[in-house]
Structures are given as structure tokens and as C-alpha cells.
From Swiss-Prot:
Keyword annotations from UniProtKB, A to Z: Aminoacyl-tRNA synthetase, ATP-binding, Cytoplasm, Ligase, Metal-binding, Nucleotide-binding, Protein biosynthesis, RNA-binding, tRNA-binding, Zinc
Pfam families: HGTP_anticodon (PF03129), tRNA-synt_2b (PF00587), tRNA_SAD (PF07973)
Chain's role: Catalyzes the attachment of threonine to tRNA(Thr) in a two-step reaction: L-threonine is first activated by ATP to form Thr-AMP and then transferred to the acceptor end of tRNA(Thr). Also edits incorrectly charged L-seryl-tRNA(Thr).
GO biological process, any: threonyl-tRNA aminoacylation
Protein name stated in the entry: Threonine--tRNA ligase
One GO MF term: metal ion binding
Record flagged with keyword Zinc: yes
Species of provenance: Campylobacter concisus (strain 13826)
Localization annotation: Cytoplasm
């Protein structure tokens, strides 16, 4: 049997240093790759990394080193001279970590008052920063060998368990996430209980680098960023514009088929309306504001208020409900520069946003309809997905009774139809609980995309109503819903999921036509016109370059189909087709090729 490295007591992980005779009422956590075990292993590995850095750079001072998904990081200052570490320094730190782990240091926990800890670390300004953020009361630290750091734990009992780890990258991070403070060095890493799991994780990291959507975006000429424009503000190039347009058109038809009405709200609204909605009090730090004619305005971070105003534009009857409004709404949210990341974290993005206004009795049926809609989309793109209910956060509007009712409605809709789901306590929006739809990509990474939120609060705040069958005024329920989440993020995920080999139906350029010489150019143009008639985007690669180079360029841009034209093809009205996704080469008539592309377009059913 594996060694016991910690315990689970009342739902919390408690290390062996803290269990203090309560073992009989706790569940043991063994040294393996379970979620709980990895939490402990990785937390201790972060401390081992810090110990190694301190050994190599004696002036180093450390801020915080928490676990993150699939690993850990530590923020620190190398010295007071501003020395920075890079990727080339990671190997030496790893070697020192292995050397220290083999010394088999016991990991010892000490508890004391905040004042005593402050005195103990009085010459360490970063420790003082940590202590400022800790509530008064007992404070703990953990020591191994000559290294000690403030920490809540939990930790391994000994460094001997730490054998299989990898430092993955170096980044910068502002102290406490505050852009006005100094930039610290941040090193990320991961750890496992066995060599095979670590090896697989490293393989996935290397594969993810090849699939990085930022790299693919350049190669496929989809989007760019420009510092003169500003960070987190993507610029869509013609190829990216075509990709987005195809996705938008498919979703537009799918929404209309399901009874949704297209609407559009303004991007700039008076601050008073954001006060009424609760955004001003609960979401202001994520918004951008400006003053016009001495009146404060806020740029919308969400589309819900605009859709509420559409609802309020007319008297509503129970016969009108449910009312389904949708919009490809452009929103702006403030993201700190340090977390901006390609299309995944941006400051401007477009949501496939919808708001459904319904009677309370219609909540379940509408949630189920949304879930089926979302499932259809994810399956068409080859994603597996799961669901999670997120409950009331610490910062929220509305009483517990309203939140309990809304959360219960979500659970019942899932339970009654056999959907499995997890619970994310405190992860809801400030105005209501939600179902998050999380997809799994080809590298087994999970991404939160779609969301469904039940909201009793905003209808109350804006005094929304409808006339029921008894001619009495009632309050509708508002369902907030996005299926992709945002076009930007979803496209980034899809690029990495497919390694840029996008499905034919949304590929920016679906066919590249390569005439061997100018004598074949007229036929290439004829084929392009035929494809245009059936909404297939093609390009003619007629540059003064070698045939092989033109084909390689099309392959680099991940174009699904490449057609090569020579004398035989012109004479026979045929094409020599290279189907990159089917990995086949074949000859066929032009009519057969046009029919093939029609079939490819019809493969998607939203």
C-alpha cells in the first residue's frame, strides 16, 4: 500500500503535521495521482522550488506560491539588483531541487501569532506583504532544512516524495496583481507521483506549444495585435473575418430556427443604469467609464441591460412568453495586462449572447432546450462536454431565498433529465447561479465556454412585468445564456483543439486552386466562380513561385482542399484534388468536385 501523505477531514485536506490524533475520523490520502494527493504534492514541490532558488540565489525573497490547475507557481524577487531569470535558468533550479529532495528533509509546521511571525520575518519585505493579507490570529509556517516560508499548507511529511517534477516556464507578475507595484519573477511547474504521468504531461505541454492559437493565428493569417492600438484588442484579418462570419451565419440560422429574435443594444450606457442593475457596485472594477456632457457613462461589459430595455419597450402578455432575444454583442472588460493571452483573455470580445424572458413555470423547459442546443453545437465541433452548477458568490445581489429558488431550478432541470454535473460553490455571477458548460479538447484540457444563468434579481430591479391569464401583473424570470461564451475565446480553443485543421464548413479558405502555369489560369478562375455560387471560399495561388512552394503555403495555412490544374485537367474539365483532412489524392470531374464540396458544407447541423 502507498504511503499516507495527508488526510481528508470534513471535506478539507489536512496534512500529517496537523491531524493531531484525529486520524480515526479522517479518510487517508495516499501517495498517488488522485486530485487530493496531487494538491499536496504540488504545494510541497512549490516550496522545494523556492528552497532551491534560495540556495542558488541567497538574496531571493518570496511572495506567494499557490497551486494552479495542473501545477503550481511561485512569485519572488531574485535580489535587490533587479536580476531576472529566464527559461535557460530552469534546468539548474531543477537540478538543485533534485539534490535537496534526496536529502529527505522532514517538513515541519510551526504555528504562532501574527506578531511573532512578523518579528521572525522582519527583514523580509515580501513576507510583510503576505502578513498584511492574513487575518489576525494564528499563523503557520513550514520549514524544510534551512528554508522556511509562511503557508497554510497542506504539505507532504518529507521531501523524499518529490521525485517527478518539471519546471515549465518563467513569467512576470505584479506584486499582489497590482499593476502599480513592482514586477516579480514567476516560475511555473508541475509534479506527479510517478514518472509516466509526468512524461505524459510534458508531452502534452510540447504538443500545446505546437498548437498555440497565437502561433496558428500568424501562420493562418487570422488575427493580429498591435501595441499602438492597445493590449487585449484583437484585429481580425480577412481570413479571420471569414472564419468569424461563417460561424456567425451558422449560429444566426440556428437561433432563428429556435424562435430567437435578433436585437441590438448600445455599447455605451449611462452609469445610472449600471447602478440600477448592480454592476456599478459589484462589477465596476471590470468596466470602463467616461464622462460626456458632465454625465458618467459606462461601456457595457455584458448585454443584459440592453436586452432588458428591449423587453421594456412594449407591454408583455403571458402569451408572448418566452421571449428570446439574441445578439452578437461586443463587450469590454478590464483585464490586467499581465493576464492578457491571445484570444483567450482580451479586453474586447463578442458574445453569442441571449436573454430569455419567461414565466417561472417555463424555466425548466427553456433550460433543457438551451442544453440541447449547446450539445448540438459542441458535438458538431467534436468536443466532449460536462456541466457544473455555480452557486452564490460572496459579492452578490438578492437575498438567499431568491438564490436558493434559482439554484434549485437549475438542479431540478438537470436531475430530472439525467444530466451529471459538479458543483462550484461560490462561482455564480453576482446576479444569479449558473450552469457552466465545460468542454474537453484534444489535449484533455477543460475549457469553460457556454453558460446558463437563472436571474430573479434583475427583473426585480428593473420592475419587469407581464400580464397573466387573470389580467394581473406578474414578474418574469430572466435566463442569461451564451453557447460559445465569446467568439474570440471559442475560436482560440477550436484552433488548438484542431491544431488549425478547422472543419471544412468554417475554414476561412476552403479550397486553394493551384494552376501549374498561366495557361491554366482561366480554368482556375472558372472553378473559383463555380465554388463561389455555392458559398465555398477559394483562392487561386498564381504567384510567380514554384508549384511546390505554392502547395506548401496552402498546407501551412491549413486549407482543407488543394486543387492542382495542368493540361489534362483543363482538357478534361477535371481536377487533381488533395484532400488534406481525408489525407487522400484523387482525380475527378469538376461537377463531382463541386458536389463533394456541397456535401462537406452540409455535414454540419446546428
Amino acid at each position: 500500500m502507498s504511503d499516507i501523505i495527508a488526510y481528508k477531514l470534513n471535506g478539507e485536506i489536512v496534512d500529517t503535521q496537523s491531524i493531531a490524533g484525529r486520524e480515526s475520523s479522517a479518510e487517508p490520502i495516499y501517495f498517488d495521482n488522485s486530485k487530493e494527493a496531487l494538491h499536496v504534492i504540488r504545494h510541497s514541490c512549490a516550496h522545494l522550488m523556492a528552497q532551491a532558488i534560495k540556495s542558488l540565489y541567497p538574496k531571493a525573497k518570496f511572495f506567494v506560491g499557490p497551486n494552479v490547475e495542473d501545477g503550481f507557481y511561485y512569485d519572488f524577487r531574485v535580489d535587490d539588483e533587479g536580476t531576472k531569470l529566464g527559461e535557460s535558468d530552469l534546468a539548474a533550479i531543477e537540478d538543485k531541487m533534485k539534490e535537496l529532495a534526496e536529502k529527505k528533509f522532514d517538513i515541519v509546521k510551526t504555528c504562532s501569532t501574527k506578531a511573532n511571525m512578523s518579528e521572525k520575518f522582519k527583514n523580509d519585505d515580501l513576507k510583510q506583504e503576505v502578513l498584511k493579507r492574513i487575518p489576525d490570529g494564528e499563523v503557520s509556517s513550514y520549514a524544510q532544512g534551512d528554508f522556511e516560508d509562511l503557508c497554510r499548507g497542506p504539505h507532504l511529511p518529507n521531501t523524499k516524495f518529490l521525485k517527478f517534477f518539471k519546471l515549465t516556464r518563467v513569467a512576470g507578475a505584479y506584486l499582489g496583481g497590482d499593476e502599480s507595484r513592482e514586477m516579480l519573477t514567476r516560475i511555473y511547474g508541475t509534479a506527479y507521483a510517478d514518472k509516466e504521468s509526468l512524461k505524459e504531461h510534458i508531452r502534452i505541454i510540447e504538443e500545446a506549444k505546437k498548437r498555440d492559437h497565437r502561433k496558428l493565428g500568424v501562420e493562418m493569417k487570422l488575427f493580429t495585435f498591435d501595441e499602438e492600438v492597445g493590449g487585449g484588442l484583437p484585429i481580425w484579418l480577412p481570413n479571420g473575418g471569414r472564419l468569424r462570419s461563417k460561424l456567425e451565419q451558422l449560429l444566426y440560422k440556428a437561433h432563428r430556427d429556435r424562435g430567437y429574435e435578433p436585437v441590438r443594444g448600445p455599447e455605451l450606457l449611462k452609469a445610472d443604469v449600471w447602478r440600477r442593475s448592480g454592476h456599478y457596485a459589484n462589477y465596476k472594477e471590470n468596466m470602463y467609464f467616461t464622462t460626456i456632457d458632465e454625465t458618467e457613462y459606462g461601456i457595457k461589459p455584458m448585454n443584459c441591460v440592453g436586452h432588458i430595455k428591449v423587453y421594456q419597450s412594449d407591454i408583455r402578455s403571458y402569451r408572448d412568453l418566452p421571449l428570446k432575444f439574441f445578439e452578437y454583442g461586443v463587450v469590454h472588460r478590464h483585464e490586467k495586462s499581465g493576464v492578457l493571452h491571445g484570444l483567450f483573455r482580451v479586453r474586447e470580445f463578442a458574445q453569442d449572447d441571449s436573454h430569455i424572458f419567461c414565466m417561472p413555470s417555463q424555466i425548466k423547459e427553456n433550460i433543457l432546450e438551451i442544453l440541447k442546443f449547446a450539445g448540438t453545437i459542441m458535438e458538431n465541433f467534436g468536443f466532449h462536454y460536462e456541466m457544473e452548477i455555480s452557486t452564490k458568490p460572496a459579492k452578490a445581489i438578492g437575498g438567499d431565498e431568491i438564490w436558493d429558488t434559482a439554484t434549485k431550478a437549475l438542479k431540478e432541470a438537470l436531475d430530472e433529465n439525467g444530466f451529471k454535473y459538479g458543483i462550484d460553490e461560490g462561482g455564480g455571477a453576482f446576479y444569479g447561479p449558473k450552469i457552466d458548460i465545460k468542454i474537453t479538447d484534444a489535449l484533455k484540457r477543460k475549457w469553460q465556454c457556454g453558460t446558463i444563468q437563472v436571474d430573479f434579481n434583475l427583473p426585480e430591479r428593473f420592475d419587469l412585468g407581464y400580464i397573466d391569464a387573470n389580467n394581473e401583473r406578474q414578474r418574469p424570470v430572466m435566463l442569461h445564456r451564451a453557447l460559445l461564451g465569446s467568439f474570440e475565446r471559442f475560436i482560440g480553443i477550436l484552433l488548438e483543439h484542431t491544431a488549425g485543421e478547422l472543419p471544412f464548413f468554417i475554414a476561412p479558405t476552403q479550397v486553394v486552386i493551384v494552376p501549374i502555369s498561366d495557361a491554366h489560369l482561366d480554368y482556375a478562375k472558372e472553378i473559383s466562380r463555380e465554388l463561389r455560387k455555392i458559398n465555398v471560399d477559394s483562392e487561386i495561388a498564381s504567384k510567380n513561385e514554384s508549384l511546390n512552394k505554392r502547395i506548401r503555403t496552402a498546407e501551412k495555412q491549413r486549407v482543407p482542399m488543394i486543387v492542382v490544374l495542368g493540361d489534362n485537367e483543363v482538357a478534361n474539365k477535371s481536377v487533381a484534388l488533395r484532400d488534406r483532412q481525408a489525407r487522400t489524392q484523387s482525380d475527378m470531374s469538376l461537377a463531382e468536385f463541386v458536389n463533394l464540396t456541397k456535401e462537406k458544407l452540409s455535414e454540419v447541423h446546428f
